[in-house]
Amino acid sequence: MLDPIAIQLGPLAIRWYALCIVTGLILAVYLTMKEAPRKKIIPDDILDFILVAFPLAILGARLYYVIFRFDYYSQNLGEIFAIWNGGLAIYGGLITGALVLYIFADRKLINTWDFLDIAAPSVMIAQSLGRWGNFFNQEAYGATVDNLDYLPGFIRDQMYIEGSYRQPTFLYESLWNLLGFALILIFRRKWKSLRRGHITAFYLIWYGFGRMVIEGMRTDSLMFFGFRVSQWLSVVLIGLGIMIVIYQNRKKAPYYITEEEN
């Protein structure tokens, strides 16, 4: 089993979980700032947005997680803020981040679709890296399996939990997001019929479908009245993505690749 603590500086423990999240954030900010001028968005505005959105998204991710496990946290109030032990729900962070983005874009007079389109692939790569934080914390895993011989030893050993090997669902989702990120990079450079909002729609459909399937493999899902919350939200994301494509096509939204770039 790998030590979840990466660096110990006296009483200060820096965990791999936090490092994975921060690494994903830094890469996401870099990629978004690099694409921003293409959509006539000032890179400094991206930094301003992150300074506001990131702490609020972390808060939203934790609040979402606590709400759906309130039976436990109502009896363990001291653990509500112990995010270093894990317990950040991606959907809570996404919902909070999207709300902050909408308000921020409106106040900065930035087209919301453009902002979402340049942010979507960055969010996806950040999610891909962030899932490795679950790996170090031994969470977000699936059902028991006989063996994991097809995986590298360090992953196999870390997925030996409570006397059994577990499906590395964190890895499946990480790779799924990485593939989605690569496809978006290709689409936004090569697909000339790509309209404003289509990248956002692709993200919603791609991530929603992958999460819906992978969530069904997990054994630690957040439940609500006997249903997996993330699977229901995944269905909503897929439906929303399809609606965005239809809406943007009907209103003949501007193409993502401008005539100057053709």
Swiss-Prot record:
Subcellular location, in the record's words?
Answer: Cell membrane
EC class of the enzyme, as a word: transferase
The entry's keywords? Cell membrane, Membrane, Transferase, Transmembrane, Transmembrane helix
Q: Which InterPro entries match?
A: Lgt
GO biological process: any one?
lipoprotein biosynthetic process
Keyword flag Ribonucleoprotein: no
Q: Name one GO molecular function term.
A: phosphatidylglycerol-prolipoprotein diacylglyceryl transferase activity
* Ranges annotated as spanning the membrane: 9-29, 41-61, 80-100, 109-129, 167-187, 197-217, 226-246
List the EC numbers from the record: 2.5.1.145
Residues the entry annotates as binding a 1,2-diacyl-sn-glycero-3-phospho-(1'-sn-glycerol): R131
Q: How does it sit in the membrane?
A: Multi-pass membrane protein
Q: Which family does it belong to?
A: Belongs to the Lgt family.
> What does this protein do, in the record's words?
Catalyzes the transfer of the diacylglyceryl group from phosphatidylglycerol to the sulfhydryl group of the N-terminal cysteine of a prolipoprotein, the first step in the formation of mature lipoproteins.
Q: Which NCBIfam families is this protein grouped with?
A: lgt (TIGR00544)
Q: What protein name is recorded for this chain?
A: Phosphatidylglycerol--prolipoprotein diacylglyceryl transferase
Supply the source organism's classification. Answer: Bacteria, Bacillati, Bacillota, Bacilli, Lactobacillales
